[in-house]
Amino acid sequence: MSEMLMLTSSDSIEINRYEEGIRNSGRSFNWVLVRDTLRFLRKSKIRKSNLVSKYGLKLVTQYFNKLEDQEGYDTIEQVIVACLDCGDHTNPKKLFEQLKSKFGKDSVRVQRIHALCLESNNQLAEALQIFESILKKYPSDALSMKRQVAIFKGQGNLSKAIQVLNAYLQIYMCDLEAWLELSSFHISYLSYSTALYCLEEVLLNAPINFVFYIKYAEPLYCLGGNENYNSAVQYYTHALELNSPTEMDKLDHPPTFLPAIYGIIMSIYSLCEEGYQLKESQLKLMEWAQNNLLTITKKYSSNDKINLVKHFIDSTDIFNKE
């Protein structure tokens, strides 16, 4: 369940400011700036593993005595996780011993870190055993449940992952990433109706994020039928309304609303294939989508991709059907 999914524009600006400050420090190590950067990342629940492992490791090994006691150990945990993300299994062992000497081997926070280290070494059975023992004492421990889901997913045991994720969402009902993860599991099983239920929970909690309207439209399209195709068009169109293409000329990269344009074309084409009498507004929308798709592709893509898009438009053309 990605923690970067909910990164806001203000968070992004703040992170860039911190990173630029660290880079501009040159050869000197500004431990205060690094401390503040890691503190911001913890508070925002954002993982920047390369940054944290590179600078945080030096912070906790050479400047640990300058950190407040609680923050120092919080930072150690943060650095351990970042190092594991980056494939470093040596430094986490040293830092783990420091945690264990402070809190004891039976501490829940120490057990969590131990399980993460085991998991990163592919000792999954041992890691699951620790997470299970934690949950027996603390049934609502979020990290243990999330790691169980991740392990079961990695093993291809989606039914078990769904079971744990359902239990997790009974406690943490507003976790958007968890609902998105659960919807993807159900889509893997072609359970589109159940996936839509999960995505409804996402839309209720994030009604202005255009990406989630695209995600909701996709299972609707997969279900098929005139009603679902019509609904899919509406959700794809609303995604465009929330992520307006009006300033496309100012972009130096392909716009992010392309999936919505593709979705509109496929949904309206499928309606036509079903013999549905298209409305005038749908015909105009189809024409607009085709024209914009071709314009965008010509601006940002090579000739090979342009030819592919032209072929796609020709194969889904409803205006010159024989």
UniProtKB/Swiss-Prot annotation:
It is a peripheral membrane protein. One of its GO terms (biological process) is protein insertion into ER membrane by stop-transfer membrane-anchor sequence. Its main location: endoplasmic reticulum. Keywords: Endoplasmic reticulum, Membrane, Repeat, TPR repeat. Pfam families: TPR_EMC2. It comes from the Eukaryota. InterPro entries: EMC2-like (IPR039856), TPR-like_helical_dom_sf (IPR011990), TPR_EMC2 (IPR055217). TPR repeats lie at residues 108-141, 143-175, 176-209, 210-246. One of its GO terms (cellular component) is endoplasmic reticulum membrane. Disulfide bonds: none annotated. PROSITE patterns: TPR_REGION. It is found in: Endoplasmic reticulum membrane. PANTHER family: TETRATRICOPEPTIDE REPEAT PROTEIN. Belongs to the EMC2 family. Part of the endoplasmic reticulum membrane protein complex (EMC) that enables the energy-independent insertion into endoplasmic reticulum membranes of newly synthesized membrane proteins. Preferentially accommodates proteins with transmembrane domains that are weakly hydrophobic or contain destabilizing features such as charged and aromatic residues. Involved in the cotranslational insertion of multi-pass membrane proteins in which stop-transfer membrane-anchor sequences become ER membrane spanning helices. Component of the ER membrane protein complex (EMC). This is ER membrane protein complex subunit 2. It comes from Dictyostelium discoideum (Social amoeba).
